[in-house]
Swiss-Prot record:
Organism from which the protein derives: Homo sapiens (Human)
Organism phylogeny: Eukaryota, Metazoa, Chordata, Craniata, Vertebrata
General remark: Antibodies against AMPH are detected in patients with stiff-man syndrome, a rare disease of the central nervous system characterized by progressive rigidity of the body musculature with superimposed painful spasms.
PROSITE patterns: BAR, SH3
Residues bearing the modification Phosphothreonine: 260, 280
Protein name (database record): Amphiphysin
Name of encoding gene: AMPH
A single MF term (Gene Ontology): phospholipid binding
Length: 695
């Protein structure tokens, strides 16, 4: 018995060695290998079919486990409802019956799925292991077949032939071929059949699952409707004990808590070195959300970042500063910007700068009302200007043309005239005093002259005439007129010297100046009437301010300045020696206005009319107002404007009322209008809530 087992074991070992040797030779290419490509395709399909069936079995088992879990959960839910149900409530037994029937339905559904689908699937997959083993055995028999064939071929091709060995090798070859063909034929028939039967199996399985599930849901729906009717009747019996939850979802749809996302605040550094750190804002995201294009269904413009809280104009300066515990020192420029000074561009803005820039307070003396002005215009209307020399001088009217320009000398003329009017009134009632009140004005005047690039020495005689007190205004007028009559030659020489100096005074204007001097001689007997007309004639020309941008305009400004100091000097000059008076008159000649005094109001009105006409020509047709962009806006369509923060847009009437009602405006950027003057090409839509209006 032991010998038999030993022989079988040795035989198996010998087979394995032969197979290993044959595979090595085949891998090395020293022995050919029998291949069946069609059978290999069958094997690949079999492996795929087995993987699909295994996955289907796994998912079906998970589905059945979920059904079992639902059965237990439903049973526990009905049990809890039955426990809380009071005995006197309607439908107590019905609730218990519904729970029991639901449990029976779940159990029946689970069992039918197990019997009709899972067991069938297990049977379907049960045939794969046997076929898989037969495929592996066939591959081994194929190696034995190749080995026997190679051994027979080697004996037949050898020079020394042994018939006994050849005949034995032929028998082994025929035996290996027979065994291989048995496995091969069976698998060649079975594998394609198994691959084709998978379709019918899938159909039967899922038809069974779907029918069972439909039947289950139909039956359990009846029970759920029964429970719903019981609960409805119970609610009707206890209608006075209704319980409502605020914010609970209604039958109309799910509960939607609408919460508008608050856009991030704009980052800003500390307002000042002494400001506390708790005033800083958290870093923000770069830009607001992309707005919907107005060319599509415009339901409204995009929502910009949260607007900043800006104080109203009625707030006083001390109230604004007290909001930040007196740690904020407002940066207010109290000097007029000169022509050579270029304002620094702020790289960063603080929250306080953004909030309070439009309402920067102006330095005012005690007892006087605070006057504020917007930095967009930097000027006040002429009828609101104050004559106090302690106030900071407002910006010149040249800023009305849209560009920042230096202070014009007409401000000096205005305050000098008004101060001289006051001095004329005081000279008749009080003795002369020290001219200390005019010292601040004298300090401002050289700065103005430096800004305009003019010779301040031409204005010094006027200032001296202003601050020298006189006892009698009539005597001063007579002295100046007599001096003017005594020095006609010097006056002519002064006028000739003014013309070649390049100050913009023509010979025709010089002739007009001579007529003015003659008119002044005839006006000497009417000194009192002149005093009465001076206040009316001085204020209006001082409002007409021309921008000083080149030398020619500076010359014209000199003439405008001289129109008022001439009358002022005649009214306020003190009596003195005759030899000094002509010299003073001669020094004043280059800055005198060659035009007669009565024509000054007419000239001012004409200049105002020309300025208004020029301003109207610079605006597009149908101009409404200006706005400033607060946030960047990128155009989504061709009919929209791409705006950057700080851009100024000229708003014109909208072609579509729907866009305007939805919050969209139509306009053209001021820079494009000034450069191209083409409204049709460069106008476009932009959201109104991305901008603020400039008054």
């Amino acid at each position: 018995m032991a010998d038999i087992k030993t022989g079988i074991f040795a035989k198996n070992v010998q087979k394995r060695l032969n197979r290993a040797q044959e595979k090595v030779l085949q891998k090395l290419g020293k022995a050919d290998e029998t291949k069946d490509e069609q059978f290999e395709e069958y094997v690949q399909n079999f492996k795929r079919q087995e993987a699909e069936g295994t996955r289907l079995q796994r998912e079906l088992r998970g589905y059945l486990a979920a059904i079992k879990g639902m059965q237990e959960a439903s049973m526990k839910l009905t049990e809890s409802l039955h426990e809380v149900y009071e005995p006197d409530w309607y439908g107590r037994e019905d609730v218990k019956m519904v729970g029991e029937k639901c449990d029976v339905l779940w159990e029946d559904f689970h069992q039918k799925l197990v019997d009709g689908s899972l067991l069938t699937l297990d049977t379907y997959l049960g045939q794969f292991p046997d076929i898989k083993n037969r495929i592996a055995k066939r591959s081994r028999k194929l190696v034995d077949y190749d080995s026997a064939r190679h051994h027979l071929e080697a004996l037949q091709s050898s020079k020394r032939k042994d018939e006994s060995r050849i005949s034995k090798a032929e028998e082994e070859f025929q035996k290996a071929q027979k065994v291989f063909e048995e496995f091969n034929v069976d698998l060649q028939e079975e594998l394609p059949s198994l691959w084709s039967r998978r379709v019918g199996f899938y159909v039967n399985t899922f038809k069974n699952v779907s029918s069972l599930e439909a039947k289950f849901h139909k039956e359990i729906a009846v029970l759920c409707h029964k429970l719903y009717e019981v609960m409805t009747k119970l609610g009707d019996q206890h209608a006075d004990k209704a319980f409502t939850i605020q914010g609970a979802p209604s039958d109309s749809g799910p509960l939607r808590i609408a919460k508008t996302p608050s856009p991030p605040e704009e980052p800003s550094p500390l307002p000042s070195p002494t400001a506390s750190p708790n005033h800083t804002l958290a870093p923000a995201s770069p830009a607001p959300a992309r707005p919907r294009s107005p060319s599509q269904t415009r339901k409204g413009p995009p929502v910009p970042p949260l607007p900043k809280v800006t104080p109203t104009k009625e707030l006083q300066q001390e109230n604004i500063i007290s909001f930040f515990e007196d740690n904020f020192v407002p940066e207010i420029s109290v000097t007029t910007p000169s022509q050579n000074e270029v304002p620094e561009v702020k790289k960063e803005e603080t929250l306080l700068d953004l909030d309070f820039d439009p309402f920067k307070p102006e330095v005012t003396p005690a007892g006087s009302a605070g006057v504020t002005h917007s930095p967009m215009s930097q000027t006040l209307p002429w009828d609101l200007w104050t004559t106090s020399t302690d106030l900071v001088q407002p910006a010149s009217g040249g800023s009305f043309n849209g560009f920042t320009q230096p202070q014009d000398t007409s401000l000096f003329t205005m305050q000098t005239d008004q101060s001289m009017i006051c001095n004329l009134a005081e000279s008749e009632q009080a003795p002369p005093t020290e001219p200390k009140a005019e010292e601040p004005l004298a300090a401002v005047t050289p700065a103005v002259g430096l800004d305009l690039g003019m010779d301040t020495r031409a204005e010094e005689p006027v200032e001296e005439a202003v601050i020298i007190p006189g006892a009698d205004a009539d005597a001063a007028v007579g002295t100046l007129v007599s001096a003017a009559e005594g020095a006609p030659g010097e006056e002519a020489e002064a006028e000739k010297a003014t013309v070649p100096a390049g100050e913009g005074v023509s010979l025709e204007e010089a002739k007009i100046g001579t007529e003015t001097t003659e008119g002044a001689e005839s006006a000497q007997p009417e000194a009192e009437e002149l005093e009465a007309t001076v206040p009316q004639e001085k204020v209006i020309p001082s409002v007409v301010i021309e921008p000083a941008s080149n030398h020619e305009e500076e010359g014209e400004n000199e003439i405008t300045i001289g129109a008022e100091p001439k009358e002022t000097t005649e009214d306020a000059a003190p009596p003195g020696p005759t030899s000094e008076t002509p010299e003073l008159a001669t020094e004043q000649k280059p800055i005198q206005d060659p035009q007669p005094t009565p024509s000054a109001p007419a000239m001012g009105a004409a200049d105002q009319l020309a300025s208004a006409r020029e301003a109207s020509q610079e605006l597009p047709p149908g101009f409404l107002y200006k706005v400033e962009t607060l946030h960047d806006f990128e155009a989504a369509n061709s009919d929209e404007l791409t705006l950057q923060r700080g851009d100024v847009v000229l708003v014109v009437p909208s072609d579509s009322e729907a866009d305007q009602d939805a919050g969209w405006l139509v306009g053209v950027k001021e820079s494009d209008w000034l450069q191209y003057r083409d409204l049709a090409t460069y106008k476009g839509l932009f959201p109104e809530n991305f901008t603020r209006r400039l008054d």
